[in-house]
Amino acid sequence: MKVTFEQLKAAFNRVLISRGVDSETADACAEMFARTTESGVYSHGVNRFPRFIQQLDNGDIIPDAEAKRITTLGAIEQWDAQRSIGNLTAKKMMDRAIELAADHGIGLVALRNANHWMRGGSYGWQAAEKGYIGICWTNSIAVMPPWGAKECRIGTNPLIVAIPSTPITMVDMSMSMFSYGMLEVNRLAGRQLPVDGGFDDEGNLTKEPGVIEKNRRILPMGYWKGSGMSIVLDMIATLLSDGASVAEVTQDNSDEYGVSQIFIAIEVDKLIDGATRDAKLQRIMDYITTAERADENQAIRLPGHEFTTLLAENRRNGITVDDSVWAKIQAL
């Protein structure tokens, strides 16, 4: 089915208000969920909203909590999210990293006791729109087996790197081949994954999203490489925030809350003039996209450029929402 941005935001806002969230906070949170969905990231927008409300109802998310600064060390700050709403707090933390970068050339905010930030790419994009390089990542509950194991002991720990090119170039990737949100998107659409995304119950690689969702044997990106990246990202976020590791979040909490996150902004224009920056970025992009195609019908993609197209299409044609997901939201 198709809905407008306004219908989507109103549906989110209604549910949040019904849970006692104050009107200003509800409006800002609903706006972020709707913008994420409008950008084409359904897995962490409309599809994720019922799960967000479940955690709100369970008390994992504290809607009136405010993040608190703990430590300042020049360009580095440490904050405690105090289990506030994840996407609103993450936006605030990247804003703060940008402010620090304006003063120091680089800004880093380490956040502990945070909730799921929904679409991590929103915060990298936020920095790139203002002309900064944006880098951020989060740890999570253990939902992926380390390479060589059957049990989930590491997080998908998504990493975002956004570059202020025209259009914005951005990598937004979990350390698994697919996020669990993308497994759900493909399952709801009745599609197999385009490449192997995990193991079946017999230990064979599979493209069946429903099988992987059920047995939780999701495949690390690049096999042992994604496994290793997940581990070191967790270690850095834990140390810089003085927060909880994947092990602590998984073993000590009843659900995925109290995670640790990193937000970095770099002011490129302190190191290179704008015209030179743009020319260098354009040459990189042109060199890549003019390579001989393996398939004449498939353009060579640059990471994140599809979001500009998806946003324009959704604004023109309306936002596609799965019927079953919309029914869940209407029932909340």
From Swiss-Prot:
One GO location term (cellular component):
cytoplasm
Q: Which InterPro entries match?
A: Diketo_gul_Rdtase, Mal/L-sulf/L-lact_DH-like_ah, Mal/L-sulf/L-lact_DH-like_NADP, Mal/L-sulfo/L-lacto_DH-like_sf, Malate/L-lactate_DH-like
Gene3D superfamilies associated with the record: 1.10.1530.10, Hypothetical oxidoreductase yiak, domain 2 (3.30.1370.60), Hypothetical oxidoreductase yiak, domain 3 (3.30.60.50)
Under Gene Ontology molecular function, one entry of this record is:
3-dehydro-L-gulonate 2-dehydrogenase activity
Domain of life from the UniProt record? Bacteria
Active site per UniProt: 44
Q: Which UniProt keywords apply?
A: Cytoplasm, NAD, Oxidoreductase
Q: Which residues bind NAD(+)?
A: 168-174, 224-225, 304-306
For this protein, the Enzyme Commission number is 1.1.1.130
Q: Subcellular location, in the record's words?
A: Cytoplasm
Query: Which reaction(s) are listed as its catalytic activity?
Result: 3-dehydro-L-gulonate + NAD(+) = 2,3-dioxo-L-gulonate + NADH + H(+); 3-dehydro-L-gulonate + NADP(+) = 2,3-dioxo-L-gulonate + NADPH + H(+)
- Say what the protein does: Catalyzes the reduction of 2,3-diketo-L-gulonate in the presence of NADH, to form 3-keto-L-gulonate.
The Swiss-Prot or TrEMBL record describes its family as follows: Belongs to the LDH2/MDH2 oxidoreductase family. DlgD subfamily.
Q: How does it assemble?
A: Homodimer.
Q: What's the protein called, per UniProt?
A: 2,3-diketo-L-gulonate reductase
Q: Which organism is it from?
A: Escherichia coli O17:K52:H18 (strain UMN026 / ExPEC)
> What does UniProt list as this organism's lineage?
Bacteria, Pseudomonadati, Pseudomonadota, Gammaproteobacteria, Enterobacterales
